[in-house]
């Protein structure tokens, strides 16, 4: 049951309209301090079993994994991305009026941070989740037999967000809208089109804009809208990760703390049959792609799935001789 303060907060949010400071209804004023969520996002150790992680994802749509990456790795990421932080934090809303002002966005992180690329290449939890949730196994029916075609998942986008004081909150939304995904209450966890992994580069709190999440919304009907009086707030320590399904309603919170910057690395994955949000073929320097493991080349779409024809070049798997293909392209 929502308490009277929460009801009052909801009423205030409903009647308060975006003013001239907010350029579009995709970016909104903060939720009043008087609102207190009814639920907290579940936290478990990153060493938890895959079964436990999947059970919480199935129930809530998202889960916090503590100590997901080391502080040393985060320090190295900061060092690698430092040259890309010279740009001033945006004074205007960007990315189609969906990334708020006072937010610095660093795109294409695989090509800019070897540490992030290594996390993607070696993290066993991410690897297991990709196989269970997004690996596509399809029974292809031929005239006289049936074959199982396997399509590997892809890295859809990899971005860093440095969110400064005054950055507005996002309207509640689902990430899989970019794929025109349709939702059903009975969707199974291995039927969603994607999932995300937020890495906390700083301590994340409600006050500095921790993501608003509606637990259980991954099981809603497609047309149901999220309301501010339904949200919980993402709060986690540096090094933790928030794993959530692309069907979960959420939105970045409002950073209310002067002088504080919230840092998030956003790793988003999708089915290999979908178009990625970020064009990895043009985001990652060829010098780095050529040195990557087959697993990373697969995740970025440079390697043809073993059980499919997707991604061919000259009727072949491009990963057989990527260097020769690059040379031919440059002629």
Curated annotation (Swiss-Prot):
Pfam families: PhyH. Coiled coil: none annotated. It comes from the Eukaryota. Residues 13-23 have a biased composition (Basic and acidic residues). It is an enzyme of class 1 (oxidoreductase). Homodimer. Belongs to the PhyH family. Dioxygenase; part of the gene cluster that mediates the biosynthesis of swainsonine (SW), a cytotoxic fungal alkaloid and a potential cancer therapy drug. Swainsonine production occurs via a multibranched pathway and is dispensable for fungal colonization of plants and infection of insect hosts. The first step of swainsonine biosynthesis is the production of the precursor pipecolic acid (PA) via conversion of L-lysine (Lys) to 1-piperideine-6-carboxylate (P6C) by the aminotransferase swnA, the latter being further reduced to PA by the reductase swnR. This is Dioxygenase swnH2.
């Amino acid at each position: 049951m929502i308490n009277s303060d929460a009801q009052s907060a909801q009423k205030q949010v409903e009647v308060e309209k975006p003013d001239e400071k907010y350029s579009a209804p995709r970016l909104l004023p903060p939720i009043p301090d008087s609102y207190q969520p009814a639920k907290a996002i579940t936290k478990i150790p990153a060493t938890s079993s895959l079964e436990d992680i999947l059970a919480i994802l199935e129930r809530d749509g998202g889960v916090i994994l503590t100590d997901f990456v080391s502080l040393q790795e985060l320090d190295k990421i900061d060092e690698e991305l430092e040259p890309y932080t010279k740009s001033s934090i945006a004074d205007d809303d960007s990315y189609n009026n969906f990334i708020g002002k006072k937010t610095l966005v660093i795109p294409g992180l695989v090509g800019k941070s070897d540490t992030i690329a290594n996390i993607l290449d070696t993290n066993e939890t991410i690897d297991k989740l990709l196989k269970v949730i997004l690996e596509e196994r399809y029974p292809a029916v031929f005239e006289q037999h049936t074959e199982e075609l396997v399509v590997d998942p892809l890295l859809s986008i990899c971005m860093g967000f440095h969110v400064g004081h005054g950055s507005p909150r996002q309207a509640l939304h689902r990430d899989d809208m970019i794929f025109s995904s349709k939702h059903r209450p009975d969707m199974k966890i291995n039927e969603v089109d994607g999932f995300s992994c937020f890495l906390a580069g700083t301590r994340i709190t409600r006050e500095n804009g921790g993501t608003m999440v509606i637990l259980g919304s991954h099981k809603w009907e497609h047309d149901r809208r999220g309301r501010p009086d339904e949200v919980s707030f993402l709060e986690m320590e540096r090094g933790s990760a928030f794993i959530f399904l692309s069907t979960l309603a959420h939105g970045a919170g409002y950073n209310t703390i002067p002088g504080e910057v919230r840092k998030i690395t956003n790793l988003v994955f999708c089915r290999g049959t979908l178009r990625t949000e970020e064009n990895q073929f043009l985001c990652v320097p060829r010098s780095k792609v050529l040195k990557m493991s087959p697993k990373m080349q697969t995740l970025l779409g440079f390697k043809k799935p073993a059980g499919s024809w997707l991604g061919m070049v000259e009727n072949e798997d491009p990963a057989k001789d990527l260097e020769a293909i690059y040379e031919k392209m440059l002629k």
